[in-house]
């Protein structure tokens, strides 16, 4: 079902309430990575260039104490957004009340306003995170229409996405996806529901438990599922192989056995690993094939696995990659992840979609982002979408 998008709305002279995902790393008032702010620009610009008033709101981190508020204010984000837009952004340091209402009512067409971190509302009974209906209604009352561009929180039913959307729709107001949300739905949705074949999924990361649902769902859709990262060794254990001191989720070995039985030759596991005696970048390491020797732990896929994975990928028409092949944050164990990222950049005939923090970081480090079809901004949201789940934040957007 196609969703209403911001380009379907008549925003002129309208107060457009827009949920953005400005959950960026901030330390002592300095933003570490403004990627998510940049990703929201096309929708913000569309609203203001077409004569609308953009009222933005977002969460940032988790608020558990009054002290957290100082470190997790959105004020530095408003400043960064102002720099990126080249125009003033009014920052309102509250989440409700007369100060916010007056600021909204004083806006001119083309103005941009950002109000304070929605999770400030969590100090008093988790009103944001538990989707308090009164809070959703209050925020909805600030705008004439609602645009949700925060894919990163689409898997959560919070007051600032689902609550606002439901209240808006109950008032007969329009609820639409922003351009970023639209792009995520298009690429992730098409990759899973209407992929061009061969379709190869690459799933990495430390824990099988994080990816069980995704592996299970994608085995029904993909031609091959490549498994790398720490979770490899839970599968090794399920096959009765030796894993030395490698990471293993003992309580997931039976699940891994079921996945191997279901997947058969669709599943591609690493055939060799780079191992060391300690979880340390500076100790000697070596390449071993198959079983991991006693006293050693596997920290990356080996060169043979890299070559085999490339062989599986070379004819692919759709590739979805989520999760690193090894301990990416240690330079000696980043090679598997970097090699996969580099190779995806050469697949010019394929739709290539990357999600997850380490995979995205690898792509950036390599500078191959422009050669890929789509880099997803949602961590947990991407995974749940790849599991085939309906995400509440997306479900709440009006259909066309």
Swiss-Prot record:
Biological-process GO terms, alphabetical: gluconeogenesis; glycolytic process
Q: Which reaction does it catalyse?
A: (2R)-3-phosphoglycerate + ATP = (2R)-3-phospho-glyceroyl phosphate + ADP
Organism's domain of life? Answer: Bacteria
Q: Which GO terms describe its molecular function?
A: ADP binding; ATP binding; phosphoglycerate kinase activity
Keyword Transport assigned: no
Predominant place of localization: cytoplasm
Sites where the protein binds substrate: 21-23, 36, 59-62, 119, 156
Alphabetical keyword list: ATP-binding, Cytoplasm, Glycolysis, Kinase, Nucleotide-binding, Transferase
Q: In which pathway does it act?
A: Carbohydrate degradation; glycolysis; pyruvate from D-glyceraldehyde 3-phosphate: step 2/5
**Under which main EC class is this enzyme filed?**
transferase
* A GO CC term attached to the entry: cytosol
Amino-acid positions noted as binding ATP in the UniProt annotation, renumbered to this chain: 211, 329, 356-359
Tell me its EC number(s), please. Answer: 2.7.2.3
**Signal peptide (from-to):** none
Q: Where in the cell is it found?
A: Cytoplasm
Which Gene3D superfamilies is this protein grouped with?
A: Phosphoglycerate kinase, N-terminal domain
| Similarity comment: family membership | Belongs to the phosphoglycerate kinase family.
HAMAP family (alphabetical): Phosphoglyc_kinase (MF_00145)
Tell me, how does this one assemble?
Answer: Monomer.
Give the protein's recorded name. Phosphoglycerate kinase
Question: What species was this sequence derived from?
Answer: Pediococcus pentosaceus (strain ATCC 25745 / CCUG 21536 / LMG 10740 / 183-1w)
Taxonomic lineage is: Bacteria, Bacillati, Bacillota, Bacilli, Lactobacillales
């Amino acid at each position: 079902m196609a969703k209403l998008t911001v380009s379907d709305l008549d925003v002129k002279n309208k107060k457009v309430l827009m949920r953005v995902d400005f959950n960026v790393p901030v330390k002592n008032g300095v933003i570490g990575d403004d990627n998510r702010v940049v990703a929201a620009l096309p929708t913000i610009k569309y609203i203001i260039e077409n004569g609308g008033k953009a009222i933005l709101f977002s969460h940032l981190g988790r608020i558990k104490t009054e002290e957290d508020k100082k470190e997790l204010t959105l004020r530095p984000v408003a400043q960064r957004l102002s720099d990126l837009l080249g125009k003033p952004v009014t920052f309102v340091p509250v989440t409700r009340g007369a100060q916010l209402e007056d600021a909204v009512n004083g806006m001119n067409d083309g103005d941009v306003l950002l109000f304070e971190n929605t999770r400030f509302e969590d100090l008093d009974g988790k009103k944001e995170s538990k989707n308090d209906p009164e809070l959703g209604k209050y925020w909805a009352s600030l705008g004439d229409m609602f645009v949700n561009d925060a894919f990163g929180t689409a898997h959560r039913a919070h007051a600032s996405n689902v609550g606002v959307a439901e209240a808006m729709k109950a008032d007969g107001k329009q609820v639409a996806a922003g351009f970023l949300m639209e792009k995520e739905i298009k690429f992730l949705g098409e990759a899973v529901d209407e992929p061009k074949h061969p379709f190869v999924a690459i799933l990495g990361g430390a824990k099988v438990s994080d990816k069980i649902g995704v592996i299970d769902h994608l085995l029904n859709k993909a031609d091959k599922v490549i498994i790398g990262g720490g979770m490899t060794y839970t599968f090794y254990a399920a096959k009765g192989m030796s894993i030395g001191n490698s990471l293993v989720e003992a309580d997931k070995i039976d699940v891994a056995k079921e996945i191997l039985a279901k997947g058969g030759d669709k599943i591609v596991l690493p055939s060799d690993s780079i191992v060391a005696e300690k979880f340390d970048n500076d100790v000697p390491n070596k390449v071993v094939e198959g079983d991991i020797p006693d006293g050693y732990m596997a920290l990356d896929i080996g060169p043979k696995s890299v070559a085999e994975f490339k062989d599986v990928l070379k004819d692919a028409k759709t590739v979805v990659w989520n999760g690193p092949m090894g301990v990416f944050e240690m330079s000696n164990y980043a090679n598997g992840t970097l090699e996969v990222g580099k190779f995806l950049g050469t697949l010019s005939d394929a739709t290539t979609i990357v999600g997850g923090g380490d995979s995205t970081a690898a792509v950036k480090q390599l500078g191959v982002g422009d050669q890929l079809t789509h880099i997803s901004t949602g961590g947990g949201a991407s995974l749940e979408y790849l599991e085939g789940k309906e995400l509440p934040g997306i479900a709440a957007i009006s259909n066309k």
